[in-house]
């Protein structure tokens, strides 16, 4: 755990890092895999908390969050802070991690099927 002025932030452990590494090895961008892994464990977090816990830079977190938002994998909620200024955004996964893994699995199966179809076409042309 990392303790900040606001609260404590869970950091990724070895199992979490392995999980993110496997997602990355399957073709997911590293920073996206890390943010998904973190949110699956933390439930919800601000970009600042994600950065502290994952050691990703703020720009890396922003790009990963944008990519996940574009894929409809995360939601964002505005949370007003006690002081002045704009509200903070808190992110969470829209689906349980098992559903995200299933979606990723289906995508890989579809890609494999397309590759096998191309190979069969090649064989037919020989």
Please give the residue ranges for each predicted region.
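N-terminal leader segment of winged-helix/HTH proteins
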Residues: 1-26, 82
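Short, cationic-aromatic polyanion-contact patches
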Residues: 21-31, 46, 79-101
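Pre-recognition alpha-helix immediately N-terminal to the DNA-recognition helix
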Residues: 33-37
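A short acidic, leucine-rich amphipathic alpha-helix
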Residues: 49-53, 68
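Key DNA-contact positions within bacterial/archaeal DNA-binding proteins
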Residues: 59-60
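Glycine-centered, phosphate/nucleic-acid-interacting loop/turn motifs that mediate DNA/RNA or nucleotide
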Residues: 72-73
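Amphipathic alpha-helical dimerization/coiled-coil segments
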Residues: 95-126
């Amino acid at each position: 755990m990392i303790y900040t002025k606001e609260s404590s932030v869970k950091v990724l452990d070895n199992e979490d890092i392995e999980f993110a590494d496997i997602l990355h090895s399957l073709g997911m961008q590293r920073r996206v895999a890390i943010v998904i892994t973190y949110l699956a464990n933390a439930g919800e977090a601000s970009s600042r908390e994600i950065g502290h816990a994952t050691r990703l830079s703020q720009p890396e977190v922003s790009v990963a969050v944008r990519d996940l938002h574009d894929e409809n994998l995360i939601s964002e909620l505005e949370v007003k802070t006690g002081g002045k200024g704009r509200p903070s955004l808190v992110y969470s996964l829209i689906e349980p991690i098992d559903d995200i893994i299933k979606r990723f699995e289906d995508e890989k199966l579809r890609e494999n099927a397309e590759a096998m179809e191309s190979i069969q076409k090649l064989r037919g042309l020989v």
